[in-house]
């Protein structure tokens, strides 16, 4: 492990390991905290990416940057394609825009992967959190005013690994097909496990966490690889959770 904000450490690592390709996942991801310490967020996400770009160039490796739907300061009901102009709505989004700019300016053998609203079988993740809350409550109150494209981390990882083995460089939106709000995601989760807990949709996501957040973070997948429907992905995620419990 090394600190991506330390350019010398990054160059030392890639020089020693000599990878053919680098998937750059290290990031500052706390949207709320980023508003109170913007310099740190930008240092990790923007400068850290610049350091990894320079390290990749030093050994001739191709690089894949994990970016985010937060690069768009979207108006309601806008679905963003890969060619749309970025316009960050918060500090985290700005840091990712700057990271993308560093990659595009200096590298031709690169991939920029945007995604968002990730879910997984992780014990502290969104899905396990919904299931745990449903065990303790008869009703959950969850926001219905943020539209997104829920994406299973396992599907995302497989697509990224497949993509980086190619020479099809460019910007990609890797998301599970379909869209929903957070309340619908929770309803689907509880329905698939047969829970009697009810979900009460409520408005109020925007502004409730102290940051400017777009009302729509939907992305359009313009090119392969295309990921399965989010409902199918959620069902497989729940299967993974069940298998880990046994």
Regions found by a protein language model. Give the residues of each.
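Mid/C-terminal beta-alpha module of Rossmann-like enzyme folds, strongest
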Residues: 136, 159, 166-210, 238-239, ...
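C-terminal amphipathic/interface module of NAD(P)-dependent oxidoreductases
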Residues: 197, 212-246
